């Protein structure tokens, strides 16, 4: 499905499964995190490269947020997030870099994604 937001569009895929007694919610979460969308493939090499290249702590960005109960678990990937400390807000957003990606276009995509979050913190909600 296509989800249109104010600044960007996303392809969305919902997944649902009934777990067997041999697989717990935590097992499934561990198996799918981090998603290739935020860490890259092949996963081990991509994670190593990110650790070497990125000079900042991702905080909640690209993490997993959700609820787990006896009867239901639901999670999402935090593909946009903000960290507020004292009078400073750090906004996190990213782009899917693949073979053939154009750096300028990817950077503009990141700026569009971040703009939605930034507008929430603007003094007049849109400055």
Task: Indicate residue ranges for each PLM-predicted region.
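Glycine-rich, small/acidic residue-mixed loop/short-helix segments
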Residues: 36-45, 49-127
């Amino acid at each position: 499905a296509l989800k249109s937001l104010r600044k960007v569009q996303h392809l969305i895929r919902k997944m649902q499964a009934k777990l067997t007694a041999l697989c717990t919610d935590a097992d499934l979460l561990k198996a799918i995190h981090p998603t290739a969308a935020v860490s890259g493939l092949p996963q081990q090499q991509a994670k190593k490269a990110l650790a070497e290249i990125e000079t900042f702590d991702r905080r909640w960005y690209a993490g997993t947020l959700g609820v787990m109960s006896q009867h239901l678990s639901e999670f999402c990937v935090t593909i946009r997030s903000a960290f507020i400390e004292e009078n400073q807000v750090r906004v996190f957003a990213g782009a899917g870099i693949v073979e053939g990606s154009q750096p300028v276009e990817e950077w503009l995509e990141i700026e569009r994604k971040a703009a939605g979050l930034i507008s929430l913190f603007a003094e007049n909600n849109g400055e």
